[in-house]
Structure formats: structure tokens, C-alpha cells
């Protein structure tokens, strides 16, 4: 608790009202950006990592509360259709891919090619009037992207998915993750672009280099390379702001708080090494901590030198699956000395996400209620009036809030079911259900869980067999139980059991309270 009070005191010393300094510290285009030009339907959206999709099998994905049936064709072009058969509106994602490469509905066998053309109706001749709705799709940097605006006359060739140059560099290693969060898209964007919350929600003090202070102000820039396409960026000197106020206390915070980044010692050491590599507190280089939001989906954060180069970048893709729901996809891209197994990264990241996901879920009903009330009154929600911004780090949130004020009310299907905006906060067992949100959609994690369950079964069975054999020989249960082999096998089984628990709900109130100490 002392460490948390120290952080609060140090932050209080650096807080300032961003509304009084925003103009001086913000650089924009020659005139204020017109966010009303943003068109949700004129962009590509990432819906899944291709490695998480089975090859030549149908899978359902969701975007703007609309379901799509997608097929990962491996080395061939993917295909995507709206997830309803024109015959009787059954879900195509419940069907299969035929040997001819057609999506076949499981209800009556109607089959469709990648263009949506009906190729077979089994009992009648195919007709252009019986087509399914095809959606342009493509694979870029391991992500499957959809372009939902083609049916509304938008041109998928006029815009391209945003790319991460480092992901194309063979010198960089990349580890990806996915989680379906019960958090609204706008809230998640604000959360990722808010470095201050790392000090409290995550106890990750090294991330303080992304925060701002009076001595190290945050610069916000807005670019519009083409009409309706924006890049909103923040930049600040990549130095520990706490250390500039009180070196001794700041270092105590760094060593005391950030080292509780994960609950498992082995994971904690690996993640601390990665976090230190990412933040580089000990580095003497003159670096800039930069975060860039490219609406609608991409956020990139990293330390960059004067030439714009980085050793590590964290990139996020947020797919707005629906009101109050977002598919969170991320990639750590860096010149790392080693590759981290994907399932191990997921253990650490799930622990990390659990620390603030329920906090966002408690915030969500109030924000969506305010949006609902504003929509009823025929006006957009004004976040600068709803929130009480006070930190110099929140200057980028002020700017992003302006974008959200203009863009969110135009989100497809946003108000189709108004009651979704009025949903209460679910219990933490729901908001932090790792199995439903992550394990079910990640084959690497499912494989790790399957292997751990097998190891648990074999270890405990072997431990029981060894103990039973010693009982038969020694005639003493107590002496048999003391067998080093039996104890070792039992411990191995327990470790496997604990590992399985990492992929289901585990962040209860008791664990939260331990993190807050």
C-alpha cells in the first residue's frame, strides 16, 4: 500500500489540466481535423489471425453485430460470405467446405462459391437470384481482413489495411494473441492509449516512460493522409517521469511493483525481461515513446530513435464485433534474443488483461448510458464533458475523444438494438472468462491445455502406481507416501493442473486484492 501511495503522490505532483495546455502542446494539421468525414464502411477490418482458423473449414466471425462465414484456404485466397443462406437464412458457418471449394449449407445443401454465386441447390437449377452475399477479404501480415462496405458501393481497392513494417523484417520476431473482450470498442481504444493506468491497474511502473509530466510534455499530432483516414499520435521523452521527481522512491516502485507483473515466478521473470527490453529504463539513448492510433482498428506503441527505428513495438488491432464487444488482437514485434512460445505469452497476457478488463466493464454501463441519452436527444456524446481529464498524459485522449464523438454515432448497427447500450455490468466470472474469450478461439492454447491435462493424468496415475507398489512392499501407507518418486510425480501433476487453470477464469476478488496491496 505504501508503494501505491508513493505513486499517487508523485503523479499528483505532475498532474495538470490538459484543457489549459492542450493548444500549446498539441500539433495538428493546418486546420482542425474534420472527423465527420470518417466512414466506417470504407475501411478493412481484421477479424482473426489466420493461424487461429482451421484450413478449408468454415468459421463464424462477427463485425458490427453482423455474422460472417469465412474460410481460410491456406496458400489460396480466403473467402467470406454473410453468414446466412438465402434459402431459409440458416447459418452457413454450420455447414462445410466441399471438395470443389464451395461453402455448403448444412440445412438443405445449397452451395456457394467465393463470389456468392449459388452453384447447387440439390433439387433445382442454380440461379443468380439465389446468391449469397460475398464480402471482399484478404490476408495481410497473418491477419484475415474483411471489407464490409462493398455492398454499399465502397471500393475495396481504394484503401489498404494498415501494415506494420517491422513485421515484414526477418530480423524481428513476432508473437500474436487474441481475446474476445466484453468491452466496447471506444473504451478499449482509450484504455490502450492511456499509459497512466499501467501504474495502478497493472502495477507496471516501467511503462511510466509513456506518461507525460510538466517537465516532459506530451505532443499530440493528427495527420489525414487522405480524406477520412487519420493517424492520431502522441510522443513524449522515453524517460521515467517518477525518477525525475524522486529517484529513490521511483526505483522502489519499479522494483517493488513491476516485479508482480505475473503470479508465476517463471512467467514473471520472462515477462520482466521482456518489459525491461521494451521500456529500456536503463538505456541512455535519446528515445521517444510514441503511440499511434490509426482508426478504425490499429494502435502501435514503441520507443523510437530520431530516425524512427525501434527495437520493439507492441501493435494492437481492435475489431468492433458489436455494441459492448471487441475482438482484441495484438502482436509483440521486436528484435528479441529468443522466441517466446505463443501459449506462454498468452498466460502472461491473460493475467495482464484480467487486471483491468473488469474495471472497464464497470465503467461501460455509465458511458453507454450517457451515449444512449445523447442519441435520444439527437446529439453525440461529448467525452470531454463526460470525463474529468486531469493528467498531462490525457492530451491524446482528449483528441481521440473528439474522433469518437464524431464517429461512434455513425457506427453500423450501433442503435439497431438500443437495449444493448443499457446492459448492466456482468459479474467478473463473465467479464474475465478466459476460456470463452481466449482458449476456445486459440488452437495453441487449446493444444497446451490438452497436453497439460494428459500430463496431469499420467503423472497422478504414475504417482498412485508407485505409492501402491511401495505399500505392497512395505506394508505402510505413510512410508509409501514419503516416496520421492511418488511425491515428484504428484507435484508434476499439480503443476500441470495449475497450468490448466491459467486458461479459465482465475482472477477473482481475492487475487485482485493481492495485486492492490
Each language-model region and where it sits:
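N-terminal mitochondrial targeting presequence
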Residues: 1-23
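A generic helix-loop boundary/linker signal
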Residues: 1-3, 14, 37, 55, ...
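Rieske [2Fe-2S] iron-sulfur-binding domain
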Residues: 15-23, 27, 32-38, 46-173, ...
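Generic N-terminal initiation segments characterized by hydrophobic and/or small/turn-forming residues
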Residues: 7-8, 12, 60, 178, ...
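C-terminal catalytic domain of Rieske-type non-heme iron oxygenases
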Residues: 33, 77, 153-517
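Short beta-strand or tight-loop elements
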Residues: 43-45, 66, 133, 218, ...
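A short, structural micro-pattern
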Residues: 41, 131, 138-140, 310-312, ...
Amino acid at each position: 500500500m505504501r508503494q501505491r501511495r508513493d505513486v499517487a503522490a508523485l503523479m499528483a505532483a505532475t498532474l495538470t489540466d490538459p484543457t489549459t495546455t492542450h493548444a500549446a502542446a498539441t500539433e495538428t494539421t493546418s486546420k482542425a481535423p474534420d472527423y465527420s468525414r470518417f466512414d466506417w464502411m470504407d475501411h478493412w477490418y481484421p477479424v482473426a489471425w489466420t493461424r487461429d482458423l482451421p484450413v478449408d473449414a468454415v468459421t463464424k466471425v462477427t463485425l458490427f453485430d453482423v455474422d460472417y462465414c469465412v474460410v481460410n484456404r491456406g496458400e489460396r485466397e480466403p473467402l467470406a460470405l454473410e453468414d446466412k443462406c438465402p434459402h431459409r437464412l440458416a447459418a452457413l458457418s454450420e455447414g462445410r467446405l466441399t471438395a470443389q471449394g464451395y461453402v455448403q449449407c448444412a440445412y438443405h445443401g445449397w452451395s456457394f462459391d467465393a463470389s456468392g454465386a449459388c452453384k447447387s441447390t440439390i433439387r433445382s437449377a442454380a440461379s443468380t437470384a439465389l446468391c449469397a452475399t460475398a464480402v471482399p477479404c484478404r490476408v495481410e501480415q497473418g491477419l484475415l481482413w474483411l471489407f464490409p462496405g462493398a455492398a454499399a458501393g465502397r471500393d475495396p481497392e481504394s484503401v489498404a489495411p494498415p501494415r506494420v513494417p517491422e513485421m515484414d523484417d526477418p530480423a524481428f520476431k513476432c508473437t500474436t494473441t487474441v481475446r474476445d473482450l466484453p468491452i466496447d470498442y471506444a473504451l478499449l481504444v482509450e484504455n490502450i492509449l492511456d499509459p497512466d493506468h499501467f501504474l495502478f491497474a497493472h502495477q507496471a511502473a516501467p511503462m511510466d516512460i509513456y506518461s507525460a509530466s510538466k517537465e516532459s510534455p506530451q505532443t499530440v499530432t493528427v495527420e489525414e493522409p487522405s480524406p477520412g483516414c487519420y493517424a492520431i499520435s502522441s510522443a513524449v521523452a522515453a524517460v521515467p517521469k517518477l525518477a525525475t521527481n524522486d529517484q529513490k522512491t521511483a526505483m522502489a516502485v519499479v522494483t517493488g511493483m513491476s516485479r508482480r507483473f505475473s503470479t508465476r515466478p517463471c512467467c514473471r521473470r520472462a515477462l520482466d525481461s521482456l518489459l525491461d527490453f521494451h521500456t529500456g529504463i536503463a538505456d541512455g539513448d535519446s528515445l521517444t515513446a510514441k503511440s499511434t492510433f490509426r482508426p478504425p482498428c490499429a494502435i502501435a506503441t514503441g520507443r523510437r530513435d530520431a530516425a524512427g527505428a525501434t527495437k520493439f513495438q507492441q501493435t494492437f488491432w481492435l475489431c468492433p464485433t458489436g455494441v459492448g464487444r471487441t475482438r482484441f488482437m495484438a502482436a509483440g514485434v521486436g528484435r528479441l534474443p529468443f522466441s517466446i512460445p505463443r501459449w506462454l505469452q498468452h498466460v502472461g497476457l491473460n493475467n495482464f488483461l484480467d487486471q483491468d478488463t473488469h474495471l472497464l466493464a464497470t465503467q461501460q454501463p455509465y458511458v453507454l448510458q450517457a451515449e444512449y441519452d445523447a442519441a435520444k436527444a439527437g446529439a453525440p456524446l461529448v467525452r470531454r464533458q463526460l470525463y474529468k481529464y486531469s493528467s498531462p498524459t490525457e492530451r491524446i485522449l482528449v483528441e481521440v475523444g473528439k474522433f469518437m464523438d464524431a464517429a461512434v454515432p455513425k457506427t453500423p448497427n450501433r442503435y439497431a438494438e438500443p437495449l444493448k447500450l443499457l446492459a448492466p455490468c456482468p459479474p467478473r466470472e463473465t467479464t474475465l472468462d478466459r476460456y470463452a474469450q481466449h482458449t476456445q478461439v486459440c488452437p495453441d492454447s487449446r493444444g497446451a491445455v490438452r497436453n497439460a491435462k494428459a500430463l496431469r493424468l499420467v503423472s497422478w496415475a504414475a504417482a498412485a502406481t508407485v505409492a501402491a507398489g511401495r505399500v505392497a512392499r512395505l506394508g505402510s501407507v505413510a512410508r509409501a507416501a514419503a516416496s520421492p518418486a511418488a511425491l515428484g510425480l504428484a507435484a508434476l501433476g499439480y503443476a500441470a493442473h495449475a497450468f490448466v487453470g491459467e486458461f479459465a477464469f482465475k482472477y477473482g476478488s481475492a487475487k485482485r486484492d493481492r495485486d492492490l496491496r
